[in-house]
Amino acid sequence: MSRLVIVSNRVPVPDKGGIAPAGGLAVALKVALEEQGGGIWMGWSGKSSGEDEPAPLAQLQQGNITYALTDLTDTDVEEYYHGFANRVLWPICHYRLDLAEYGRKEMAGYFRVNRFFAHRLAPLVKPDDVIWVHDYPLIPLAAELRQMGLENRIGFFLHIPWPPADVLFTMPVHEEIMRGLSHYDVVGFQTDHDLENFASCLRREGIGDALGGGRLSAYGRIFKGGVYAIGIETAAFAEFAKKASTNSTVKKARESIERRSLIIGVDRLDYSKGLTQRIEAFERFILANPAQRGRVTYLQITPKSRSEVPEYEAMQRTVAEQAGRVNGALGAVDWVPMRYINRSVGRRVLAGLYRLGKVGLVTPLRDGKNLVAKEYVAAQDPDDPGVLVLSRFAGAARELQGALLVNPYDIEGTANAMARSLSMPLEERQERWTTMMDQLLEHDVSRWCRDFLNDLTASSDRCG
C-alpha cells in the first residue's frame, strides 16, 4: 500500500496525550490517515514571526502518523491566509463578490506561500507516495510540486463551493487558479452542482471541457473530476451523543432548559452561515406564535473565527447585538429566549447538546457541505428524534432528504419551518430521521476517504 501524505493549511497538533483539536475536517483527515495505516500530515503550525525566514520544518510522531509542521512569517500569514485566501477566494466561492478585496501583494503572497509549502514538502515525499491536498488555500500546490519534478499521484479536494463562471471570472487571477487545479490527477468536489460549475468554467473560458466518464481536459492535460460527499464518523458520533447524557455540562444544560423545547444552532462565526437571518427568523417565529413564549429556548453556539479579517470582527459585534436585542424585546424575568455562546464547545458535549435539541437549525446562505447537519442527525434519540431545518443552499441538502428544507433568505419561511418542526408528530419525525440516518451510516467519513483514494490510486492519466 502506498503511503498517504495529506497537506492542509492547518494541522491539528495532538497534545501530549495524543488528542488533537476536534473539528469536522480534522476528524475526517485523521480517520483517512489511520485507515491507510498512517502517513504524513503536513501544513502550517499556526505560528508566525517577524523573521524573513521561518524556522526549519518540525516533525512530531504520534503512533503511525508523522505531523510535519512549518511556521510562516507574519507577512506570509497576512498576504496568503488573511489576504488572498480569505478576502478573495472565500467570498468569491460563497458568491459574495461585494466582500472580495483584490490586491497584487496578496495575490503574489498566495502563490509564494504555496511555492514555499512545496519546497518544504518535497524532501519528505517518496516516489510511490500518494499526496492528498485539501481546500482553497492550497490550490496551486500541485503545480509547484510538478515544477520541482514530482510525478506522484496528487489529488485535491475542495471543501467549499465552486462558483459559477460569471462569479469566478470577476477574480483577476481566475485562470491561474483553474490552471493550478489542472495539475492534479483527481479534483474532488462536494456536490454535482460544484463539478458542473467547474466544467462550465473550463468551457466558458475556452480552456477545456468534460470528456465523459468523469474525465476533464484543461491546458492539454487530462484529469478526473469527481463528487465525493464528505461524511462524519456516524456510528461513533451517535455513541458520543448516547453516552453524553451523564456529562456534567450536558446535565446542567438539560436542567436549565427544564421543560422547554430546545432549538440549537452551531456555526463558526462567518457571514456565509446566515446567522443574522436565522436570529431574525427565530424572532419572527416567537412573534407569530405567542403560545411559544416561555416554552422554547434557542441556543446558538458560534466560536470566533478569523478575527483578524475586518468583516468577521464586525460580524461578531452585529450578531451579539442582535441576540441582545431579541432577548431584550422578547424576554421575561423567568425566560431568556436566546442563549448565545461565542466560544468553542467540546465535541462530546456538543453531541449531547444536539441530542437535547428538538430542532436543529442549519441555515447557511451558502455552504460546501455542512457537517453540523450530519452530526445533529447522528446525535438524535431514535425513539424521539428532533427535526433538522436545513438550508437548500447547503451541500448536505442533496443528501439529507428527511430535513425540512428552507430558503434562509425567506425569513417567514424559516420561521414557519420552526413552528412545523415543534408540532411534527412522532411518527413523521422518526420516518424522516431514519431516512437520513441510513444515508449517513452508508456514506460516512470512511466511505468518503475510500472513494476518493480509490479513484486517485486508480488514476492512469497523470498531469505534467
From Swiss-Prot:
Catalytic activity: D-glucose 6-phosphate + UDP-alpha-D-glucose = alpha,alpha-trehalose 6-phosphate + UDP + H(+)
Pathway(s) annotated for this protein in UniProt: Glycan biosynthesis; trehalose biosynthesis
EC number: 2.4.1.15
Gene Ontology biological process terms, A to Z: trehalose biosynthetic process
Residues bound to D-glucose 6-phosphate: R10, Y81, D135, R306
GO terms, molecular function: alpha,alpha-trehalose-phosphate synthase (UDP-forming) activity
Site (Involved in alpha anomer selectivity) residue list: W90, I160
InterPro entries cross-referenced by the UniProt entry: Glyco_trans_20, Trehalose_OtsA
Keywords linked to the UniProt accession: Glycosyltransferase, Plasmid, Transferase
Pfam family, one: Glyco_transf_20
Residues reported to bind UDP-alpha-D-glucose: G23, G24, R268, K273, L371, V372, A373, K374, E375
Complex formation: Homotetramer.
Function summary: Probably involved in the osmoprotection via the biosynthesis of trehalose. Catalyzes the transfer of glucose from UDP-alpha-D-glucose (UDP-Glc) to D-glucose 6-phosphate (Glc-6-P) to form trehalose-6-phosphate. Acts with retention of the anomeric configuration of the UDP-sugar donor.
Family indicated by similarity: Belongs to the glycosyltransferase 20 family.
Name of the featured protein: Trehalose-6-phosphate synthase
The species this protein was found in: Sinorhizobium fredii (strain NBRC 101917 / NGR234)
Encoding gene per record: otsA
